[in-house]
Structure formats: structure tokens, C-alpha cells
């Protein structure tokens, strides 16, 4: 670390999609506070402009509550970290604007954080697994990745829509509402008949758009019970991801697997991964529910790791990056 033995204290801001969060964490892994507020659309899916309006509205309260719960002021933190991407442009701008304001007003360094990498780092911290293969699944992301030669390398990802988006869209179209994943899974557990649906794995990548289209068509045709369509959809979608994860373990020779991201709360996916990992004699870690979805603490902790190794950005250069990939980011705080 560039700052000796003292653990650095960083305030982190998350606003990439439907959640606005503020966390405070140290570079040694202490999570001091984690306060989040989630936008829930009244109808349909997430609308970026509405989500951004929500973030702007709740930001002062969330920030104030986080500081109060942690018992500190902005003056007492060493830096301000913010998720600059990937994510929805209007939402990202809310968090970036607040972070820039705090950095300038209180004279604090500004630390750019990749949202996806923050999911990986908070899961490393909370599971205690040092060098796993990650299955990162959320509404906006689906990838299998692991650390290699200074970066997180992608060993498989969706070629079109993310898994979470696939299930959320299906749920919305059939009237189950938002969030869709738990509601689809609830009906899937009542399914009795598996109906073959498109299973699309291309090399190490997956495709969910065709699966979604066929599942919706099947339901609308009236030829199958909704419970059976949900069961078939979940079974197919998750099995594709498990196949890619197993290939990544085989290719890298690693024995640890971590499930992270919002869909990490899925008991069905967890059980499928657990059986696969146990068959290989490996170890499965799962990020705790409070850190599975988007949250401010993961930005604060990852920001603290980055800042302790000299990462910072001038305010005038802190542009949002809606399509920022994990493999574009050098990871100076990891040697292996």
C-alpha cells in the first residue's frame, strides 16, 4: 500500500441503475455503513430518467443517514469513490455529480470505481475466497470472470441480454411485476413439466434473447401452464450459465467459485452451482444478501482498495462510462 499501515477510510456512492447507495469502508475491509434506496417502477421496467429523478430526490437523505449511522463527517474520510460505470447514463450522472461536489467542497481525492469490479471485490471480502472464478449475474450484467495477469478476464458473458433482464422482462410481460426473478422462481418451483426451450451456448458465451422470445411465445399460445413455462425457462437459463462456469473452472484450474450480483439471491441457481462445484471437489462462496444487489458499501470498499494503491482521477476528467468493461481496468491491489 502507498499509505503505509494506516487503513484508509473512503465514502462510496452507487447510482448505476435502480439503486442509490452510500457506503463507508476501510481499505482493511471494515464496512462502517451501507445505506441504500431502490427505485421501483410503477409499471414496466426501469426507466433511466425516472430512476435518475429518484436518485436525485433521495440522495441528500441517504448521504445524511449514512454519515449519521457511521458517526463521522465527510471531513473525516480520506477520499470519495464513485461508480462511473457501467450503467445507465442518467443514473450514473447523479452519483458522479454528488461525488464531484463532495470532492471539491471538502478537498477530497476522487476515486473512480468500476461497478462490476466492486461486485467482485465485495464478494471476495465477504466470502473469504481469495482467487475464485466469479459468476456475476444481475439485471444488467451476466459474466463469468476471474483474475489473471493484472486484470479481471472475462471467460464467458451474454451475447445479448443479461440473465436478470431476461427473467425480469418475462415476468413483466406475463403480469408478474417487478422484480421478476423471485416471482418467476416462485412459480418455477410449482412447475411439473419441463418443456424444451432454446439452449444457446456459443463457445464460452450465452444468449438469452431467443430463450426469452420462445418462453413468451409458449405462454401466449396457451399450450402450457405458466408454472411449467417458468420452470422450463429457469431450468434452461441457469443450466447454460452453470455449463460456462464449469468450463471456466476447468480452463483456469481453479477450485473456488463465487456467485455474486443481484441474482445471487437465487436459491435455484445457487443449488445448481453447488452441485457442480461439489462434483468437482471445489468450494462455492455466495455473497451475503445485503451485498448481492447494488450497494454503496461495495463502491466504498473497492474505492478504498484502489485509493490505497494510488488510483484517483481529477474531477474535470471524471467522465461517466456507461459501457466500461471489467477487462479494461488494471487492478493494482492484486498480485494474483
From Swiss-Prot:
Names of required cofactors: Fe(2+)
Binding site for Fe cation: 115, 119, 136, 294
A molecular function (GO) term: iron ion binding
Keywords from the UniProt entry: Acyltransferase, Cytoplasm, Iron, Metal-binding, Transferase, tRNA processing
SUPFAM superfamilies linked: Actin-like ATPase domain (SSF53067)
Cofactor note: Binds 1 Fe(2+) ion per subunit.
GO BP term (any one): tRNA threonylcarbamoyladenosine modification
Amino-acid positions noted as binding substrate in the UniProt annotation, renumbered to this chain: 136-140, 168, 185, 266
Database matches in InterPro entries: ATPase_NBD, Gcp-like_dom, KAE1/TsaD, Kae1_archaea_euk
GO annotations of cellular component type: cytoplasm; EKC/KEOPS complex
Catalytic activity, as annotated: L-threonylcarbamoyladenylate + adenosine(37) in tRNA = N(6)-L-threonylcarbamoyladenosine(37) in tRNA + AMP + H(+)
Enzyme nomenclature, EC number: 2.3.1.234
Cell location: Cytoplasm
UniProt similarity note: Belongs to the KAE1 / TsaD family.
HAMAP family listed in its UniProt record: Kae1
Its job: Required for the formation of a threonylcarbamoyl group on adenosine at position 37 (t(6)A37) in tRNAs that read codons beginning with adenine. Is probably involved in the transfer of the threonylcarbamoyl moiety of threonylcarbamoyl-AMP (TC-AMP) to the N6 group of A37.
Name of the molecule in the record: tRNA N6-adenosine threonylcarbamoyltransferase
Protein's organism: Thermofilum pendens (strain DSM 2475 / Hrk 5)
Amino acid at each position: 500500500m502507498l499509505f503505509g499501515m494506516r487503513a484508509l477510510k473512503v465514502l462510496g456512492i452507487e447510482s448505476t441503475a435502480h439503486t442509490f447507495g452510500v457506503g463507508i469502508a476501510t481499505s482493511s475491509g471494515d464496512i462502517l455503513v451501507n445505506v441504500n434506496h431502490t427505485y421501483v417502477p410503477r409499471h414496466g421496467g426501469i426507466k433511466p430518467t425516472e430512476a435518475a429523478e429518484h436518485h436525485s430526490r433521495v440522495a441528500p437523505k441517504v448521504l445524511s443517514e449514512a454519515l449519521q449511522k457511521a458517526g463521522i463527517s465527510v471531513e473525516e474520510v480520506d477520499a470519495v469513490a464513485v461508480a462511473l460505470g457501467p450503467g445507465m447514463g442518467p443514473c450514473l450522472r447523479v452519483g458522479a455529480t454528488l461525488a464531484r461536489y463532495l470532492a471539491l467542497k471538502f478537498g477530497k481525492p476522487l476515486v473512480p470505481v468500476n461497478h462490476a469490479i466492486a461486485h467482485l471485490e465485495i464478494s471476495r471480502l465477504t466470502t473469504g475466497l481469495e482467487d475464485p472464478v466469479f459468476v456475476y449475474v444481475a439485471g444488467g450484467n451476466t459474466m463469468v470472470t476471474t483474475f489473471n495477469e493484472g486484470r479481471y478476464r472475462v471467460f464467458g458473458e451474454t451475447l445479448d441480454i443479461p440473465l436478470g433482464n431476461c427473467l425480469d422482462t418475462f415476468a413483466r410481460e406475463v403480469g408478474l411485476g417487478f422484480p421478476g426473478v423471485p416471482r418467476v422462481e416462485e412459480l418455477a418451483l410449482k412447475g411439473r413439466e419441463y418443456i424444451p426451450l432454446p439452449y444457446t451456448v456459443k463457445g464460452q458465451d450465452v444468449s438469452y434473447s431467443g430463450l426469452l422470445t420462445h418462453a413468451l411465445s409458449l405462454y401466449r399460445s396457451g399450450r402450457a401452464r405458466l408454472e411449467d413455462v417458468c420452470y422450463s425457462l429457469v431450468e434452461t437459463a441457469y443450466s447454460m450459465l452453470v455449463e460456462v462456469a464449469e468450463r471456466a473452472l476447468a480452463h483456469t484450474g481453479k477450485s473456488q467459485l463465487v456467485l455474486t450480483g443481484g441474482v445471487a439471491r437465487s436459491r435455484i441457481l445457487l443449488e445448481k452451482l453447488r452441485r457442480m462445484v461439489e462434483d468437482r471437489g471445489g468450494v462455492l462462496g455466495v455473497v451475503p444478501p445485503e451485498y448481492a444487489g447494488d450497494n454503496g458499501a461495495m463502491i466504498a470498499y473497492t474505492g478504498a482498495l484502489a485509493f490505497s494503491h494510488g488510483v484517483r482521477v481529477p474531477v474535470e476528467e471524471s467522465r461517466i462510462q456507461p459501457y466500461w468493461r471489467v477487462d479494461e481496468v488494471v487492478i493494482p491491489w492484486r498480485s494474483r
